C-alpha cells in the first residue's frame, strides 16, 4: 500500500480516525500487538491479538510493513492549515533513498508501534522483523 493507505487502515478507517488511539485499534498495545514485551523474540501467527475497528490485524507490531512511498523525513513538516500541506492531501514524495516502513515489530518498544510512527530504509534492508501487506485499491 501507499503510506496514506497504510495509515488510513491502521487508524481504523474514516469513522475511527478521530478516536485518539495511539496504536491500531487501542490505546493499550498489549491488546492489539506483538512487540518486545510479549513476543518471545519472534513473529507471531497473524491474528493472535485483537483486530482494529475495521477488522484488520497486526497493523501495530509483529513486523514492520513496507509502504510504496519514498521516505522524506520533512514531508509532514508543512503547516496543516496550508491547503497544499501533505496532511490535507498526501501524495508521497517523488524520490528518496529509502522507502517508508510503518507499524513496528516484535522486536520494538511501544513507541515504535504507534500508528503515527514512520521510518525509511533502503529496499535492500532485510531483516526477520520486516514484511509487507498485500493490498488493493478499489
Please name every model-derived segment.
Residues 1-31, 66:
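Short, well-ordered surface patches within globular domains
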Residues 4, 54, 128-132:
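A structural signal for well-ordered alpha-helical segments within the folded catalytic domains
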Residues 9, 35, 116:
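Residues that scaffold the ATP/ADP-binding catalytic core of kinase and kinase-like folds
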Residues 14, 21, 39-42, 59, ...:
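Surface-exposed recognition segments
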Residues 26, 37, 49, 68-71:
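Histidine- and/or cysteine-centered catalytic micro-motif in compact active-site loops
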Residues 31-56:
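A short, contiguous structural element within a folded domain that forms the immediate neighborhood
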Amino acid at each position: 500500500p501507499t503510506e496514506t493507505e497504510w495509515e488510513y487502515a491502521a487508524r481504523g478507517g474514516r469513522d475511527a480516525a478521530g478516536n485518539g488511539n495511539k496504536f491500531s485499534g487501542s490505546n493499550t498495545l498489549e491488546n492489539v500487538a506483538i512487540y518486545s514485551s510479549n513476543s518471545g523474540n519472534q513473529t507471531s501467527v497473524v491474528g493472535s491479538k485483537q483486530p482494529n475497528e475495521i477488522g484488520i490485524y497486526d497493523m501495530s507490531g509483529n513486523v514492520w510493513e513496507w509502504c510504496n512511498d519514498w521516505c522524506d523525513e520533512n514531508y509532514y513538516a508543512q503547516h496543516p492549515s496550508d491547503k497544499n500541506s501533505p496532511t490535507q492531501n498526501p501524495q508521497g514524495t517523488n524520490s528518496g533513498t529509502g522507502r517508508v516502513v510503518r507499524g513496528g515489530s516484535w522486536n520494538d518498544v511501544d513507541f515504535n508501534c504507534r500508528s503515527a510512527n514512520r521510518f525509511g530504509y533502503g529496499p535492500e534492508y532485510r531483516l526477520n522483523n520486516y514484511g509487507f501487506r498485500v493490498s488493493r485499491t478499489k
